């Protein structure tokens, strides 16, 4: 609610962004798309699985060597969409709830094919369980 920019996104404090993340995202904002999507790696126990976040996937699903996801909290989304789809007041599954809501409003995207985000899963610190179908990546 306190944001003042045209777009809103979340970077989890235990994840890593690519050195060119800001340059690529800021350049993409001129497209005026509802959401900026990108690729990255899901990292668990030093094993990396590539992922792609895009509207073209039409759902969240896993292949043995690739995760496909719809736009979610990691993607810059227009502020007015984010405000109409606020996070629910809970600390488990709130990101999945938000993703489901924003995908009802998003009409177009600007996709960056580069790996910009590295989702660092640690079973010792994460509240997300590996077999949870609501998780952003599992």
Question: Language-model features: where?
Answer:
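Short, conserved alpha-helix that lines the donor NDP-sugar binding/gating region
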Residues: 1, 99-100
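Conserved nucleotide-sugar donor-binding
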Residues: 4-5, 71-85
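Short aromatic/hydrophobic "clamp" motif used to bind/position activated sugar donors
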Residues: 8
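The conserved acidic donor/metal-binding loop of glycosyltransferases
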Residues: 12-16
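Conserved donor NDP-sugar-binding/catalytic core segment of glycosyltransferases
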Residues: 20-50
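A recurrent flexible, glycine/aromatic-enriched loop bordering the glycosyltransferase active site
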Residues: 58-77
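Acidic donor-binding loop at a coil-to-helix junction in glycosyltransferase catalytic cores
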Residues: 92-98
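Active-site donor/metal-binding and catalytic loop motifs
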Residues: 112-137
